[in-house]
Amino acid sequence: MILPTSEDRRIIWLQRWLALVALALIGTTWRLWTASTEFPRIPWFSWLCEIPNWCDRVALAGLISGLVSVLVLAPWRERFAAPKVRLAIFAILAVSGGMLLLLDQHRLQPWAYQFAWIVLVLATAPAGRALMLIRLLTIGIYLWSAISKFDATFLATTGPDLLHGLWQTLALDPHLLDGNRASTLAWGLPLGELAVALLLAMPWTRRFGLLVSIVMHGLLLVVLGPWGLDHQPGVLLWNLYFIGQNILLFGARIEPVAGSERRWGLAEMGISLALLLPILEPFGWFDHWPAWAVYAPGAERVTLLLDAAAAERLPESMQAHLGSPQWRDGGRVVRTDLWSLRALSAPIYPQGRFRAAVASAIIERYQFDEGATLVVESRADRLTGDRERRVFRGADAIKRHATSYWVNTRQ
């Protein structure tokens, strides 16, 4: 593959690649963006709860039109580089995309958050500076993702699960993962991400880092694909995006354009925030996904339990999302994670606040005054995996807990 060597041409390829993958991701998760299912829509601010669902569709139409414009116009540099044209396109992307994200916390999927920062950079920085900033963002994603997985819970659960999926897909000897070997080998997953971050950060190892990153994402495609753990298409598309993006960012040498350097600006401020805010995540002051804690199972757990009578009152569409009876009286767990995957083709937002909001919305919708219990487990201790548990019984106690968060939990 022959890559363009000029900054302007490389950034055009990156813009088109981002627009293409973003359209594909929106297409595979379209129900998430249209507010067209029973799954609760939880805005970030309570004053947004009254906005009708048709506004989501108008904003989505604007976002799609902006992405299509980038895809179609980017090859015509003279037209796309015209200040008025670029301003109009990126204004449409910013307004429509921002509205969609504000109207539902669930939409802050990791790829959507990443793309939002990249669009800010593309809109406000010259080509050379934009490439440098997006490189920094990419390195930061690998770094923070690795740090989030140096965790007892990951090494005991998700890490071994991924390894078992890889072993099964590649038909490797399963006995190699017997006993504690899987947990020991799971250390290689965050260490691999950390190695990619360090290799990409240093110019003299960047090409090797690119190769390692491609192998890593390729293996994830194998493990998470339909021939492995069969995860949602969005997960596969995001990994595919990283392969293409990294080739464009860290591939063949790029010839700088005169005048592409500049001082501190809006793009630099945005990427600095994206790289620094994850520091707050372990203290509970920043959400898991924006901190790039992906596939990190140590987040707060929130589980809604219904007794047998309450479970029977659910409509048939909700019965499919109930877990097996776990109580002596036949009580059931409401699997909101499965509900999200089946209804929206997207993983549920992992924050305890959001899961409590979804539980509260279910109780309010089906008027469960009694028969509902919410079990809230704290984030896992990084060294031991231990959690503290709180139990809220009845609709009033559950709603009080849901409204105790700083961020909105109303639908």
PLM ranges: what are they?
Residues M1-Q411:
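Alpha-helical membrane-anchoring segments
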